[in-house]
A protein has these predicted regions:
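Extracellular receptor-binding modules and their adjoining Ser/Thr/Gly/Asp/Asn-rich linkers
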Residues: 1-210
Length: 210
């Protein structure tokens, strides 16, 4: 495959925030949750990590958790159920007078429920979507996805996240899987470039045992 060839987006992704933005390209890396910041992500250190969330990617067929507006713009409870208030407005109703043979409009009160703006919401402040902020990134959770590798992974075989110890070099990259070691393994479908492969993020292919 040529470097300038277009790749159709596939898979399902959600937006996650980096604990620390990688110095090199942040795309095509296996990621897990950060031990110091549990709600944020970091490149996987080895295939034995308890939780491999997915692979960072530029685009997928469907992206979740990337709202167009600030999600707390309106008051809500702890699980996100928005509070409503009864708002009375006047609406115009068109009627026809059969005796006088003409139409006229009169107003009557109308009750409806509206969301309650949050006291912390500033409508004058422009909201920037997560996908347009460098500290956030798409993570492919299921389906086919492209991941960086050391150039040695083969289609039809399995790969696993690189075990680099404390070194950050190539952390989150794929390497050929050691099938004699218990850990997360992922099926390689094809080689894309010299240092990228396509794999399948599928729960049915995780945690192969020796």
């Amino acid at each position: 495959m040529q470097d300038n060839e277009y790749i159709n987006p596939v898979g399902y992704s959600e937006m996650y925030e980096w604990a620390e933005i990688p110095a090199e390209s942040p795309y095509g890396l296996f990621v897990t949750f950060s031990s110091e910041n549990p709600d944020k992500i970091e490149p996987v250190k080895s295939s034995s990590d308890e939780q491999i969330l997915g692979v960072t990617t530029i685009q997928t067929a469907h992206t979740s958790d990337d709202p167009n507006n600030w999600k707390y713009a309106y008051m809500c409870n702890e699980v996100g159920d928005k509070f409503l208030k009864n708002d009375k407005i006047a609406i115009g109703v068109k009627e026809y007078d059969q005796i006088e043979e003409f139409s006229y409009i009169h107003t009557r009160p109308y009750n409806h429920y509206v969301q309650i703006p949050s006291q912390y919401y500033d409508p004058n402040q422009e909201y920037v979507k997560r996908s347009n902020r460098k500290e956030w990134i798409r993570v492919n959770l299921i389906g086919k996805v492209i991941v960086r590798d050391n150039g040695k992974c083969k289609p039809g075989e399995y790969c696993e996240p690189n075990s680099t110890g404390k070194s950050k070099k190539q952390r989150g990259y794929a390497v050929p899987a050691d099938m004699n070691v218990h850990g997360w393994k992922f099926y390689v479908t094809q080689r894309i470039t010299e240092n990228t492969i396509e794999i399948v993020m599928s729960p049915t292919m995780n945690k192969l045992k020796n």
